[in-house]
């Protein structure tokens, strides 16, 4: 037997140990590379999203919701909790002239129609901006971004400080809504809250969150 490959000899054990260390180093290098690439994708995604949000918020403050609609044809309004970072455009598709066959078009698209992990809040196709009940969907993002921010309503101090939110529809004045109830539920379960929200399209104003982007 070749002494170099015989781990029962000192030389064989050294060769075997070097091989183990080499494969261990190679494995760690691959893991580090994958983690590095994932971190870069995450930071690039965050940077791009921050830029989009800053641009459209600046445009809204400068030109108003009506003029924004001229640039973003699917935009139907703006949703905001004043005094917080919760301030987003609301889109709607699934209707004539607006991606009729895909009412969830903005589930994973930004305001420009490009792929986005975060998506953009959008109004249920069954609603119009003058409906009694506006069902608006948005991702429940970890870190309380987008509709993940609504988790703050679990805290009574936040609720008391921010008891209202506003919605400004294109061509209309800003309307304020009082938060009278906050329900947290599983969107896949037929809980009373989910059943009620599906049936009562003329009752109250609801904000839906999706956990698809947790």
Name what the model sees in each region.
Residues 2-63:
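N-terminal membrane-targeting segments
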Residues 4-8, 126, 213:
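Intrinsic disorder/low-complexity detector
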Residues 51, 149, 199-200:
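Exposed alpha-helical structural elements
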Residues 57-78:
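Short extracytoplasmic
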Residues 71-182:
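Cell wall/extracellular polymer interaction/catalysis modules
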Residues 177, 181-207:
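Acidic, glycine-rich loop-and-strand cores that form catalytic or ligand-binding grooves
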Residues 208-214:
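Conserved small/polar residues in nucleotide/adenosyl-binding loops
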């Amino acid at each position: 037997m070749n002494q170099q490959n015989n781990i029962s000899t000192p030389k064989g054990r050294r060769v075997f140990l070097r091989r183990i260390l080499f494969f261990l180093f190679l494995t760690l290098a691959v893991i580090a590379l994958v983690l590095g690439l994932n971190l870069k994708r995450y930071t690039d995604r965050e940077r791009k999203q921050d830029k989009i949000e800053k641009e459209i918020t600046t445009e809204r403050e400068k030109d108003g919701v009506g003029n924004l609609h001229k640039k973003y044809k699917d935009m139907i309004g703006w949703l905001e909790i004043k005094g917080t970072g919760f301030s987003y455009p609301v889109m709607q598709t699934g209707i004539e002239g607006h991606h009729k066959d895909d009412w969830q078009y903005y589930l994973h698209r930004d305001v420009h129609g490009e792929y986005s992990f975060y998506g953009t809040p959008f109004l249920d196709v069954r609603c119009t901006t003058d409906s009694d009940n506006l069902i608006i969907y948005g991702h429940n993002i970890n870190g309380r971004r987008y509709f993940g921010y609504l988790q703050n309503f679990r805290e009574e101090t936040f609720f008391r400080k921010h008891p209202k939110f506003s919605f400004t529809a294109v061509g209309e004045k800003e309307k304020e809504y009082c938060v009278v109830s906050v329900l947290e539920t599983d969107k896949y379960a037929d809980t009373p809250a989910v059943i009620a929200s599906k049936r009562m399209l003329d009752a109250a104003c609801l904000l839906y969150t999706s956990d698809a982007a947790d």
